[in-house]
Amino acid sequence: MSVKHFIQITKPGIIFGNVLSVAGGFFLASKGHVDFALFLAVVIGTSLVVASGCVFNNCIDRDIDHKMERTKNRVMVQGGMSLTLALAYATLLGVAGFSLLYVQANPLAAFCALVGFVVYVGFYSLWLKRKSVHGTLVGSLSGAMPPVIGYCAVSNSFDLAAVTLLVMFSLWQMPHSFAIAIFRFKDYSAANIPVLPVARGILAAKKQIVLYVLAFVLATVMLTLGGYAGLGYLAVAAAMGLYWLYMAWGGYKAEDDSKWARKVFGFSILTVTALSVMMSVDSQTAADVLMTYAR
């Protein structure tokens, strides 16, 4: 056991991705008036909570991770850390993260983090991931919480912008996850995990990817229509979203489903990164009504 194991078991890549979305929500709510001490506390607090969830996930999935090519070398599978130590480590990370969010941000931000944590560890990892094709849908709520945490840490209110962020990032999670399930089809089949491509076929997953990307594109527009983000954000969101939709539609003609799915997955990362950046730099004063720009 080494320091490397303590880092690897937290899934640093997932933490980094969540930091980007936390920052997007935080700066969206800040509207140019940034409290950097608060920002640092929110980023660290959320990262600790996410890390805790990932460690718990590693503990829960240790019996199926050895069946999958991409997870067979994880710390718990290789015996790099005992279950007792991993559970204690996960608990410590969680307590530290929730405490930091509660004390340095506000109870609402901590509550949002708790909801995401419970959904990911309890409903998704412990239950639905192995039992239902709808596990991805439920799990998407946890993946959508980081930008909401960032936003609520500043605004201390769960308003239309927070709802929009929750919907946007939940919708984004679906095609992102389905794409992974397609190019990792053999892994999920071997572990008997009922993700959509395995349970209902790749064609069904392709249809859902197109529908969810379309819904995501429509949802991204709401930040501008609600008066929370500017036209620069709208232009980037529309361009990225429509190209992602075009790419998703191309799945119907794809000769190599795995190659196509990897492209959809890769562009999903670019899309959510671009939107997080744009909502950070092109925020507007919040509107009281939905159709600010439609008057």
Swiss-Prot record:
EC identifiers of the protein: 2.5.1.141
Main localization, broad class: membrane
Localization (cell): Cell inner membrane
InterPro entries named in the record: Protohaem_IX_farnesylTrfase, UbiA_prenyltransferase, UbiA_prenylTrfase_CS, UbiA_sf
Gene Ontology biological process terms, A to Z: heme O biosynthetic process
PROSITE patterns named among the record's database cross-references: UBIA (PS00943)
Gene3D superfamilies assigned to the protein according to its UniProt record, in alphabetical order: UbiA prenyltransferase (1.10.357.140)
Enzyme class: transferase
GO molecular function per UniProt: protoheme IX farnesyltransferase activity
Pathway connected to this protein: Porphyrin-containing compound metabolism; heme O biosynthesis; heme O from protoheme: step 1/1
Keywords on record: Cell inner membrane, Cell membrane, Heme biosynthesis, Membrane, Transferase, Transmembrane, Transmembrane helix
Pfam families according to UniProt: UbiA
Topology of the protein relative to the lipid bilayer: Multi-pass membrane protein
Transmembrane regions: 9-29, 36-56, 83-103, 108-128, 135-155, 163-183, 209-229, 230-250, 264-284
Superkingdom as given in the UniProt entry: Bacteria
Reactions accelerated catalytically: heme b + (2E,6E)-farnesyl diphosphate + H2O = Fe(II)-heme o + diphosphate
GO cellular component, one term: plasma membrane
Family: Belongs to the UbiA prenyltransferase family. Protoheme IX farnesyltransferase subfamily.
Function: Converts heme B (protoheme IX) to heme O by substitution of the vinyl group on carbon 2 of heme B porphyrin ring with a hydroxyethyl farnesyl side group.
Further remark: Carbon 2 of the heme B porphyrin ring is defined according to the Fischer nomenclature.
The name this protein goes by in its record: Protoheme IX farnesyltransferase 2
Annotated organism of origin: Pseudomonas entomophila (strain L48)
